Design a protein with these regions (language model features):
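Acidic, mature catalytic/reactive cores of soluble proteins
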Residues: 19-190
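Bacterial Sec-dependent N-terminal signal peptides
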Residues: 1-22
Protein backbone atom coordinates (compact mmCIF):
# COMPACT_ATOMS: atom_id res chain seq x y z
CA UNK A 1 0.00 0.00 0.00
CA UNK A 2 2.80 2.41 0.86
CA UNK A 3 4.37 1.79 -2.56
CA UNK A 4 1.06 2.56 -4.26
CA UNK A 5 0.74 5.81 -2.32
CA UNK A 6 4.29 6.83 -3.18
CA UNK A 7 3.74 6.15 -6.90
CA UNK A 8 0.39 7.95 -6.91
CA UNK A 9 1.82 10.90 -4.98
CA UNK A 10 4.79 11.17 -7.32
CA UNK A 11 2.49 11.05 -10.34
CA UNK A 12 0.48 13.90 -8.85
CA UNK A 13 3.64 15.87 -8.11
CA UNK A 14 3.29 15.42 -4.34
CA UNK A 15 5.91 14.28 -1.89
CA UNK A 16 4.79 11.37 0.27
CA UNK A 17 6.37 11.73 3.67
CA UNK A 18 4.34 9.20 5.63
CA UNK A 19 3.13 11.54 8.35
CA UNK A 20 -0.22 12.69 9.60
CA UNK A 21 -1.02 16.39 9.33
CA UNK A 22 -1.02 18.14 12.68
CA UNK A 23 -3.79 20.55 13.50
CA UNK A 24 -2.87 22.91 16.33
CA UNK A 25 -6.49 22.83 17.53
CA UNK A 26 -6.67 19.01 17.69
CA UNK A 27 -5.92 18.68 21.44
CA UNK A 28 -8.61 21.24 22.30
CA UNK A 29 -11.13 19.51 20.03
CA UNK A 30 -10.26 16.14 21.55
CA UNK A 31 -10.68 17.53 25.06
CA UNK A 32 -14.03 19.08 24.14
CA UNK A 33 -15.34 15.76 22.80
CA UNK A 34 -14.09 13.86 25.85
CA UNK A 35 -15.71 16.35 28.22
CA UNK A 36 -19.05 16.56 26.41
CA UNK A 37 -20.18 13.01 25.66
CA UNK A 38 -22.94 13.43 28.26
CA UNK A 39 -24.52 16.24 26.19
CA UNK A 40 -25.18 13.82 23.32
CA UNK A 41 -27.10 11.24 25.37
CA UNK A 42 -30.83 10.83 24.73
CA UNK A 43 -33.32 8.33 26.12
CA UNK A 44 -36.74 8.01 24.58
CA UNK A 45 -38.36 4.64 25.25
CA UNK A 46 -41.72 5.28 23.57
CA UNK A 47 -42.42 5.89 19.90
CA UNK A 48 -43.22 9.59 19.53
CA UNK A 49 -44.35 10.99 16.16
CA UNK A 50 -41.54 9.83 13.83
CA UNK A 51 -39.03 9.04 16.60
CA UNK A 52 -38.59 5.34 17.35
CA UNK A 53 -38.42 4.55 21.06
CA UNK A 54 -35.33 2.62 22.13
CA UNK A 55 -34.85 0.69 25.38
CA UNK A 56 -31.42 2.07 26.38
CA UNK A 57 -29.86 5.54 26.57
CA UNK A 58 -28.10 6.35 23.29
CA UNK A 59 -25.88 8.99 21.76
CA UNK A 60 -26.83 11.34 18.93
CA UNK A 61 -24.48 13.07 16.45
CA UNK A 62 -24.39 16.40 18.25
CA UNK A 63 -25.55 18.17 21.38
CA UNK A 64 -28.56 20.43 21.21
CA UNK A 65 -32.05 20.05 19.83
CA UNK A 66 -31.22 19.28 16.20
CA UNK A 67 -30.94 15.51 16.67
CA UNK A 68 -32.96 13.25 18.95
CA UNK A 69 -32.32 10.10 16.91
CA UNK A 70 -29.30 7.84 16.66
CA UNK A 71 -27.78 6.95 13.29
CA UNK A 72 -26.43 3.57 12.27
CA UNK A 73 -22.91 4.09 11.03
CA UNK A 74 -22.33 7.24 13.09
CA UNK A 75 -22.85 4.98 16.10
CA UNK A 76 -19.95 2.73 15.11
CA UNK A 77 -17.53 5.65 15.21
CA UNK A 78 -19.16 7.14 18.30
CA UNK A 79 -18.80 3.80 20.10
CA UNK A 80 -15.09 3.75 19.34
CA UNK A 81 -14.74 7.16 20.98
CA UNK A 82 -16.93 6.21 23.91
CA UNK A 83 -14.84 3.13 24.64
CA UNK A 84 -11.61 5.09 24.31
CA UNK A 85 -12.91 7.72 26.72
CA UNK A 86 -14.09 5.25 29.36
CA UNK A 87 -17.82 4.99 28.58
CA UNK A 88 -18.24 1.34 27.56
CA UNK A 89 -21.74 1.24 29.10
CA UNK A 90 -22.95 3.86 26.60
CA UNK A 91 -21.30 1.99 23.73
CA UNK A 92 -23.06 -1.20 24.86
CA UNK A 93 -26.39 0.63 25.15
CA UNK A 94 -25.96 2.00 21.63
CA UNK A 95 -25.21 -1.49 20.35
CA UNK A 96 -28.13 -3.02 22.25
CA UNK A 97 -30.44 -0.41 20.71
CA UNK A 98 -29.32 -1.34 17.19
CA UNK A 99 -29.83 -5.03 18.01
CA UNK A 100 -33.30 -4.09 19.26
CA UNK A 101 -34.06 -2.42 15.92
CA UNK A 102 -33.12 -5.62 14.08
CA UNK A 103 -35.35 -7.67 16.38
CA UNK A 104 -38.23 -5.23 15.95
CA UNK A 105 -37.90 -4.37 12.24
CA UNK A 106 -35.70 -7.08 10.73
CA UNK A 107 -32.94 -4.55 9.99
CA UNK A 108 -31.30 -1.40 11.31
CA UNK A 109 -32.77 1.72 9.80
CA UNK A 110 -30.49 4.55 8.65
CA UNK A 111 -31.56 6.30 11.88
CA UNK A 112 -34.13 5.82 14.63
CA UNK A 113 -36.91 7.65 12.77
CA UNK A 114 -39.79 6.02 10.92
CA UNK A 115 -38.96 7.90 7.72
CA UNK A 116 -35.59 6.12 7.59
CA UNK A 117 -37.36 2.76 7.25
CA UNK A 118 -36.43 2.33 3.59
CA UNK A 119 -32.83 3.56 3.91
CA UNK A 120 -29.85 1.52 4.96
CA UNK A 121 -26.28 2.40 5.85
CA UNK A 122 -23.09 0.40 5.92
CA UNK A 123 -23.68 -2.57 8.26
CA UNK A 124 -21.24 -2.06 11.13
CA UNK A 125 -23.31 -3.91 13.73
CA UNK A 126 -21.20 -7.08 13.73
CA UNK A 127 -18.07 -5.00 14.44
CA UNK A 128 -19.89 -3.23 17.28
CA UNK A 129 -20.96 -6.57 18.73
CA UNK A 130 -17.38 -7.83 18.51
CA UNK A 131 -16.09 -4.72 20.28
CA UNK A 132 -18.60 -5.03 23.13
CA UNK A 133 -17.96 -8.75 23.53
CA UNK A 134 -14.20 -8.13 23.76
CA UNK A 135 -14.89 -5.59 26.52
CA UNK A 136 -17.40 -7.62 28.51
CA UNK A 137 -16.61 -11.26 27.73
CA UNK A 138 -20.36 -11.93 28.10
CA UNK A 139 -20.89 -15.16 26.14
CA UNK A 140 -24.66 -15.23 26.61
CA UNK A 141 -24.94 -11.66 25.29
CA UNK A 142 -22.78 -12.66 22.32
CA UNK A 143 -24.93 -15.73 21.60
CA UNK A 144 -28.10 -13.59 21.63
CA UNK A 145 -26.45 -10.91 19.49
CA UNK A 146 -25.25 -13.54 17.02
CA UNK A 147 -28.82 -14.70 16.41
CA UNK A 148 -29.83 -11.10 15.74
CA UNK A 149 -26.85 -10.54 13.44
CA UNK A 150 -28.00 -13.51 11.35
CA UNK A 151 -31.34 -11.74 10.94
CA UNK A 152 -29.63 -8.54 9.81
CA UNK A 153 -27.48 -10.55 7.39
CA UNK A 154 -30.68 -12.01 5.95
CA UNK A 155 -31.96 -8.50 5.22
CA UNK A 156 -28.76 -7.64 3.35
CA UNK A 157 -28.93 -10.85 1.34
CA UNK A 158 -32.63 -10.38 0.46
CA UNK A 159 -32.97 -6.62 0.07
CA UNK A 160 -29.53 -5.22 -0.73
CA UNK A 161 -27.94 -7.83 -3.00
CA UNK A 162 -26.75 -6.69 -6.44
CA UNK A 163 -26.59 -8.89 -9.56
CA UNK A 164 -22.82 -9.18 -8.99
CA UNK A 165 -23.43 -10.92 -5.67
CA UNK A 166 -22.22 -7.93 -3.67
CA UNK A 167 -24.34 -5.96 -1.22
CA UNK A 168 -24.95 -2.24 -1.26
CA UNK A 169 -26.78 0.19 0.96
CA UNK A 170 -29.57 2.24 -0.55
CA UNK A 171 -33.14 3.44 -0.35
CA UNK A 172 -36.46 2.01 -1.39
CA UNK A 173 -38.47 4.92 0.03
CA UNK A 174 -42.04 5.56 -1.03
CA UNK A 175 -43.26 9.09 -1.77
CA UNK A 176 -44.95 9.15 1.66
CA UNK A 177 -41.67 8.40 3.47
CA UNK A 178 -39.85 11.06 1.46
CA UNK A 179 -42.58 13.59 2.31
CA UNK A 180 -42.32 12.70 6.02
CA UNK A 181 -38.55 13.21 5.89
CA UNK A 182 -38.93 16.57 4.13
CA UNK A 183 -41.30 17.87 6.82
CA UNK A 184 -38.82 17.09 9.60
CA UNK A 185 -35.87 18.33 7.54
CA UNK A 186 -37.70 21.59 6.87
CA UNK A 187 -38.33 22.10 10.59
CA UNK A 188 -34.63 21.63 11.30
CA UNK A 189 -33.68 24.21 8.70
CA UNK A 190 -36.17 26.71 10.06
Amino acid sequence: MKKILIVMSAAAGLAFVGCRPQNPDAPAVREFIRDNWHTTVQHCTADTATLIGLPYPYTVPTAGAMFREMYYWDTFFTNEGLVRDGHPELAKGNTDNLLYMVRRFGKVYNGSRTYYEARSQTPYLSMMVDRIYRLTGDKQWLADAYQTLKEEYGFWMRERLTPTGLNRYGSSASDALVDEFLVTGGKRLG
